[in-house]
């Protein structure tokens, strides 16, 4: 569920703000 949430680009930016590793994970999950 959490992965599906962060895979959405708008959610990823909010959830991963300032967290490069998390942003990279989101990108791998299909977010832009």
UniProtKB/Swiss-Prot annotation:
Keywords: Disulfide bond, Ion channel impairing toxin, Neurotoxin, Secreted, Toxin, Voltage-gated sodium channel impairing toxin. GO terms for cellular component: extracellular region. It comes from the Eukaryota. Expressed by the venom gland. The keyword Disulfide bond applies. Residues 2-32 form the LCN-type CS-alpha/beta domain. SUPFAM superfamilies: Scorpion toxin-like. It is found in: Secreted. One of its GO terms (molecular function) is sodium channel inhibitor activity. The keyword Transport does not apply. Has the structural arrangement of an alpha-helix connected to antiparallel beta-sheets by disulfide bonds (CS-alpha/beta). Alpha toxins bind voltage-independently at site-3 of sodium channels (Nav) and inhibit the inactivation of the activated channels, thereby blocking neuronal transmission. This toxin dose-dependently delays inactivation of voltage-gated sodium channels (Nav) (EC(50)=0.91 uM), and shifts the steady-state activation and inactivation to hyperpolarized direction. In addition, it dose-dependently alters calcium dynamics and increases phosphorylation of MAP kinases 1/3 (MAPK1/MAPK3) and cAMP-response element binding (CREB) proteins in neocortical neurons. Belongs to the long (4 C-C) scorpion toxin superfamily. Sodium channel inhibitor family. Alpha subfamily. This is Sodium channel neurotoxin BmK NT2.
């Amino acid at each position: 569920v959490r992965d599906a949430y962060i895979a959405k680009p708008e959610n990823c930016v909010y959830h991963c703000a300032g967290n490069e590793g998390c942003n990279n994970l989101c990108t791998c999950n299909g977010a832009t």
